[in-house]
Structures are given as C-alpha cells and as structure tokens.
Amino acid sequence: GRYRPGASGYATANLGLLYDWNHTGKGLKVAEVVENSPFDHSRSKMVAGVIIEKIDGVEIGADMDYNVLLNDKARKKTLVSIYNPQTKERWEEVVLPISSSAFNTLLYSRWVKNRAADVEKWSNGRLGYVHIQSMGDPSFRGVYSDILGKYNHCDGIVIDTRFNGGGRLHEDVEILFSGKKYLTQVVRGQESCD
C-alpha cells in the first residue's frame, strides 16, 4: 500500500471575514463580511470597519498570529469581542466558525458573483457570465441552468474556464453552445462521450 502520513496539528477555523491588512493597531479590522459566512445574518452587527478585539476572551495584539485562537474551533461556539471605532460601541457575539474549506467555497462564490457583476456592468446587461469550475457533471448542470435560466435574455455568455480543475466536459459544452456534435471519442471500441 501507499504510505500517507497522519494529519498533524490543528485544523484552523475561519470567521468568514476579510481583514484590512493596513490596520496597524491591536485587533483585526474587518474589511468585509463574506456572504453566507458566520456573521452574515440579521442578528449580527458585524460590518466593515469594526475591530475584533478578542476571540474567546484572548486579546489580539498588533503583531499576534490570531489564527491560533481559531485552532480546532470549526462548528464550535466561539465568543468574539468587537469594537466599533465610529460609534465607540463594544459588544460580543457568539458564532460558529467554519472550516477553511467551507470558507474557500464562500470565496469562490464571491469571486464568481463579482465576475458576473463586472460582465453585466461592462456589457450594459447584454452578456451573462458563467464559470466552469470543473469539467464534470455538477459544473455542467450549473452552467446549463444559468444559461437557460437567469441568462436566457442575454445576447451572449462569457464562459470562464480559468482555474478549472480539468476533466472531460468540453464535448458537452461544445454541443450546448453550437447544437452540433463535432467529435466522437471512442475508447476501447465504445463511444465515451454520449
């Protein structure tokens, strides 16, 4: 068999926030609350510009690696102490941090949403935007749904395949957009792309 080393260290959770790295004082200055993240709900007062002063009662120093305060905290109640420098208000909120992979998924959704907004703006609403994340069936179904659904009224579609993990979706995408089968791929005597 193949040797695989065991996991070492802690899994570091994430609060679902983007930070202002130009902030030089104590704490973490919030630049953005990522959509669908732990603080993105109606009861939270978390907004861009506030400072996270403490996590579970531990003060975040100016040069401190705050990540250690989130080790092994995914889906566990975590107390976050917040300060709003504009209103001078301090408060605490309890959240359930998410895993790094869950945060990466949120960042991907944010990236796609921002690209779609750019395309809509630059084309004056004439073009839609889809990103093909991977060359597999779930990604194809999402593209198909977007093209025939929310972008049905558009004059064209920007198809983005950057950072695509690869696969065998190219035939399906070509047929979707052209209506014609341009290739028959035969592997060991059987058509593999029907």
What are the language-model segments listed below?
Residues R2, G6-S8, K29-P38, V58-D194:
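Cleft-lining beta-strand/loop regions that shape enzyme active-site pockets
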Residues V47-E53:
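Structural motif
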